Structures are given as C-alpha cells and as structure tokens.
Amino acid sequence: MAPIPFEHALVLASVLFVLGLVALLIRRNLIVMLMSVEIMLNAAGLAFIAAGSRWGQPDGQVMFLLILTLAAAEVGVGLGLGLQVYRRHKTLDVDRLSEMQG
C-alpha cells in the first residue's frame, strides 16, 4: 500500500481545521463549540503527523501525543463547566448566556 502524499495530508488537515473553525464561529451551542475545537486540534495533530512522516522525524508523533493530552484536558474541563452552566441557567446557548449576564 502506497503512503499518502504529504500534500494530500496537509490539504485534509486544512479542510478539517477550516470546518472546525467555521462550526465554531457559526454554532452557538456550547457542546458543538467544544466538538469544533476538538476537530481543529485533531487537524493540527494530523498536520504534525504528516510533517513528521515527510521528513522522517519522530517529533510529529510527540506533538500529536501532546495535542491529544491537551484535547482530553480541554474536553474534561469544558464538559464540567458546561454541566455547571446547564444546571444553573438551563441552557447551553452562548448568546442566551451573554444576554442573561447583562
């Protein structure tokens, strides 16, 4: 099986990153925003893996492990905060939360 060309991996990473960014800017639900950030982090990890594979360096894999750790921490904290926000305000819509604050 032939390896995926470097340019194709970067294009895929770019498309995933842009999709995550667009979803982050358009959607106002806190859970969807967290998922969008996860997509963006995975796209960055894919770019690191592709670059490390292209130049034969293990640094891309190390950075991907760092990104996975960061993403797991972000999800844990984000979902915990989201749960508290939902319990207090009964909504996860970021715009409605901004209106409530004044």
Curated annotation (Swiss-Prot):
User: Superkingdom of this entry's organism?
Assistant: Bacteria
Catalytic reaction annotation: a quinone + NADH + 5 H(+)(in) = a quinol + NAD(+) + 4 H(+)(out)
Taxonomic source organism: Methylococcus capsulatus (strain ATCC 33009 / NCIMB 11132 / Bath)
Its cellular-component GO annotations read: NADH dehydrogenase complex; plasma membrane
Q: Where in the cell is it found?
A: Cell inner membrane
Similarity-based family: Belongs to the complex I subunit 4L family.
> Which enzyme class?
translocase
The record's annotation in Gene3D superfamilies points to: 1.10.287.3510
The intrachain disulfides are: none
Give a yes or no for keyword Transferase in this entry: no
Q: Which Pfam families match?
A: Oxidored_q2
What EC number(s) does its UniProt record assign? 7.1.1.-
Please provide the record's keywords in A-Z order: Cell inner membrane, Cell membrane, Membrane, NAD, Quinone, Translocase, Transmembrane, Transmembrane helix, Transport, Ubiquinone
* Assembly notes: NDH-1 is composed of 14 different subunits. Subunits NuoA, H, J, K, L, M, N constitute the membrane sector of the complex.
For membrane topology, the record states: Multi-pass membrane protein
What is the official name of this protein in its record?
NADH-quinone oxidoreductase subunit K
Q: What does this protein do?
A: NDH-1 shuttles electrons from NADH, via FMN and iron-sulfur (Fe-S) centers, to quinones in the respiratory chain. The immediate electron acceptor for the enzyme in this species is believed to be ubiquinone. Couples the redox reaction to proton translocation (for every two electrons transferred, four hydrogen ions are translocated across the cytoplasmic membrane), and thus conserves the redox energy in a proton gradient.
Output the GO biological process annotations, alphabetical, semicolon-separated: ATP synthesis coupled electron transport
What parts of the sequence cross the membrane? Answer: 6-26, 30-50, 62-82
Q: What is its main location?
A: membrane
- One Gene Ontology term of the molecular function aspect: NADH:ubiquinone reductase (non-electrogenic) activity
